[in-house]
Amino acid sequence: MEEFKRYFELDRYQQHDFLYPLIFQEYIYALAHDHGLNRSIFLENAGYDNKSSLLIVKRLITRMYQQNHFLISVNDSNQNQFLGHNKNFSYQMISEGFSVIVEIPFSLRLISSLEGKXIVXYPNLRSIHSIFPFLEDKFLHLNYVLDILIPYPIHLEILVQTLRHWVKDASSLHLLRFFLHEYRNWNSLITPKKXSFSCSKRNERLSLFLYNSHVXEYESIFVFLRNQSSHXRSTSSGALLERIHFYGKIELRVGVFAKDFQSXLWLFKDPFIHYVRXQGKSILASKGTXLLMNKWKYYLVNCWXCHFYVWSQPRNIYRNQLSNYSLDFLGYLSSXRLNTSMERSQMLENSYLI
């Protein structure tokens, strides 16, 4: 970690993170190979064993300096030569190392925050296991639910723009842009399937990093609910140390929302709103009225489009009344059964004897 820090100290006053030199360091790929999510990435390719994998990486990095080795054809076939090797194999190898590199700013900020000051504990930051108490204890007392499919970026460039808030190294962002645009037709990193995300299994680490970066931006609009919500962490966020910085980053956006949405701030004063998220969808449940949930629905759509440049159609947000709706979440069907009681009233006529 000390060896990584020196690349950040070159221009610290301007807060530029020089990550690009790390791409050409061989030990980065050894780290990705030993501690990455796809340990078998080097072993699945015929003709390459564990002992020769680092030598292959070193040759690939050396050839990146030479322009004549970028033999990229218009045809997106798996047999195209990229850096003198199989295109998919070379891309996987380099992008795995690149994934480790772009995670460094997140880990360094986490370490500095731990050493510099005590982190405020948020009692609403709960694990995936908090969903079940929510369904058992809170669900029965709510009236309406918004079943939300997490919106996906309109364009791959949106993912790059999202990382610009974290990584200030232009060269690294250009390389990421090259990866995304060159391989957007090859088993896409983040593929919208039925308006939900599907991460590539061939490069899971980079897919999860980009996915969680995008979801962190999407969820930042719920800053006003952080003290009341039942927040469930995504089960696929293991590759991104984002949770602490998620709450630190959204504090900066409070002024933006307070300025642009003064008339809508009363929406966030409902103390009976609960929020959970998992498996490409999120749920916003409330004890409020149907009018309040409709206002939430159109506010979310407009806010995502204006501030985060993500496309979410109103038809991807379903408003349902819990008395007539079964909630499908994490393989469980939950419904609220109304206990009706019948009351009989009888008017007694007073008779007066005259």
Curated annotation (Swiss-Prot):
One of its GO terms (cellular component) is chloroplast. One of its GO terms (molecular function) is RNA binding. It holds the Pfam family MatK_N. Keywords: Chloroplast, mRNA processing, Plastid, RNA-binding, tRNA processing. It comes from the Eukaryota. The keyword RNA-binding applies. GO terms for biological process: mRNA processing; tRNA processing. It is found in: Plastid, Chloroplast. Usually encoded in the trnK tRNA gene intron. Probably assists in splicing its own and other chloroplast group II introns. Belongs to the intron maturase 2 family. MatK subfamily. This is Maturase K. It comes from Hydrangea quercifolia (Oakleaf hydrangea). The lineage of its organism: Eukaryota, Viridiplantae, Streptophyta, Embryophyta, Tracheophyta.
